[in-house]
Amino acid sequence: MEARDIILRPVVTEASMAGMDNKRYTFDVDLRATKTQVKNAVEEIFGVKVVKVNIMNVKGKLKRQGRYEGYTKRRRKAIVTLSADSNEIKLFNDNNEN
């Protein structure tokens, strides 16, 4: 798998945004990705030094539409901790255009 196939998207929640102050970034990753693959992908794409990777599998939630029910997609979430001397990852543009 290539690096851009492993990292799918950043997770933007209150908890993940609070973790960015401590250089902890949260990403949705491919279901088959390992910790080593996630570490190498983040280092390759963003040019930073990764210290630790925590991965969790998130089950799909039960959703209903009338009498029909199904599950949302399951996903795999990776929390990546960067080294203290590493640069921050810019996930958002700082364009303040009106």
UniProtKB/Swiss-Prot annotation:
GO terms for molecular function: rRNA binding; structural constituent of ribosome. GO terms for cellular component: ribonucleoprotein complex; ribosome. It comes from the Bacteria. GO terms for biological process: translation. SUPFAM superfamilies: Ribosomal proteins S24e, L23 and L15e (SSF54189). Keywords: Ribonucleoprotein, Ribosomal protein, RNA-binding, rRNA-binding. One of the early assembly proteins it binds 23S rRNA. One of the proteins that surrounds the polypeptide exit tunnel on the outside of the ribosome. Forms the main docking site for trigger factor binding to the ribosome. Belongs to the universal ribosomal protein uL23 family. Part of the 50S ribosomal subunit. Contacts protein L29, and trigger factor when it is bound to the ribosome. HAMAP family: Ribosomal_uL23_B (MF_01369_B). This is Large ribosomal subunit protein uL23. It comes from Limosilactobacillus reuteri (strain DSM 20016).
